[in-house]
Amino acid sequence: MSLDGFVAGPDQSVDNPIGVGGMRLHEWVFPLRAWNAMHGQEGGEVNESNRIVEESFANLGATIMGRNMFGGQPGGWKKGTPKKGKPWNGWWGDDPPYHHPVFVLTHHPREPLALKGGTTFNFVTDGIESALAQARRAAGKKDVAVAGGASVARQFLAAGLVDQMEINLVPILLGAGERLFDGVGADLHGLEIVSTVATPRVTHFKFANS
């Protein structure tokens, strides 16, 4: 998240899913060994940020995300992309970094999409409570992550369904885009700081909902 509260830049599109300037919010994670390992690559930086990313993903058994985070393209599911003419399976390629079941909130039904590495995208049309129940069953004794985007995160926060929240605060100003907390400030209270880790490129906050 930027210092002015944005988690995506303006003018999000199929070609630019996190908006103008949005990639700057994630530049800290790309050199990390943990990020490379999730994408089947070797090497990378080992530092405090790497430790936090490893810990965040170590006990995940399922992830929830919105339609836009899966692959944009509002409306009914298209058969392919304008550029490649292939079936549209989202932004994540043939071997996504999740390696566990993912539940995608959408208004448009679709059969589950099984890809390499253990990732299966399941499409949920009956709301956040249903997505959470399905994700909990799939995760078993492991944790469930609400990955985003901002709209989905706001729904879970407003409903009081978030036990812990992690924010990676990047020292930049975007000036415009999509804010995480728009419209949920009055509903969000009782947060406690669990940990704070500052690095030159990002500060990692973990909150618990009391």
For each predicted feature, which ranges?
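Enzymes that bind and transform nitrogen-containing heteroaromatic metabolites
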Residues: 1-210
